[in-house]
Amino acid sequence: MKTPPVLKRRREGVTDYRKRYRLVISRETRAVIRQTRKGLIIQLVDYVPEGDHVLVTVTNKTLKKALNIDGNNIQMYYLAGYMAAKKGISLGISGAVVDTGRAIFRKGGRIAAAIKGLIDGGLEINADEDIFPDESRLNGEHLKQRLDINEIKSKIGE
């Protein structure tokens, strides 16, 4: 018997098909969080057999155009998650499961901040409170150029 071929996306380390299968069979909207070299991408995605259907996309460029803020830190990930949740709720999405892909998830890190933003924005996501960054880090007390999170959240909510 011949060994089955290894799929290209698995060989390149892009897709974990076991994890993707478990997420897809849940039949819930996925909150896809991806880190790039210079920014982030947060998408709310539904599975259809022909291919995934992207409902909402928020990137660091979206935040820069809409709110004139820039960066690649915990505050930006939190605000991007918050904005994605608000856009998703306006489309009738109430909850999601988190899809971090092959990214290494760290307690209190940027991905955790994005999940916190999704939850604070109103999406129902099953996550433990221990993984989120402290409020002081979300408010940017560790940064030289911090953002006023509450002011920006009120702009997003409008």
From Swiss-Prot:
Cross-referenced InterPro entries: Rbsml_uL18_euk (IPR005485)
A Pfam entry, by short name: Ribosomal_L5e
GO biological process, any: translation
Flavoprotein is among the record's keywords: no
Gene Ontology terms, MF aspect: 5S rRNA binding; structural constituent of ribosome
GO CC terms of this entry: cytosolic large ribosomal subunit
Sorted UniProt keywords: Ribonucleoprotein, Ribosomal protein, RNA-binding, rRNA-binding
Domain of life where this protein originates: Archaea
Ribonucleoprotein is among the record's keywords: yes
Job description of the protein: This is one of the proteins that bind and probably mediate the attachment of the 5S RNA into the large ribosomal subunit, where it forms part of the central protuberance.
PANTHER family per record: LARGE RIBOSOMAL SUBUNIT PROTEIN UL18 (PTHR23410:SF12), RIBOSOMAL PROTEIN L5-RELATED (PTHR23410)
Cross-referenced NCBIfam families: PRK08569.1
Assembly, per entry: Part of the 50S ribosomal subunit. Contacts the 5S and 23S rRNAs.
Family recorded in the similarity comment: Belongs to the universal ribosomal protein uL18 family.
Protein name per the record: Large ribosomal subunit protein uL18
Organism: Picrophilus torridus (strain ATCC 700027 / DSM 9790 / JCM 10055 / NBRC 100828 / KAW 2/3)
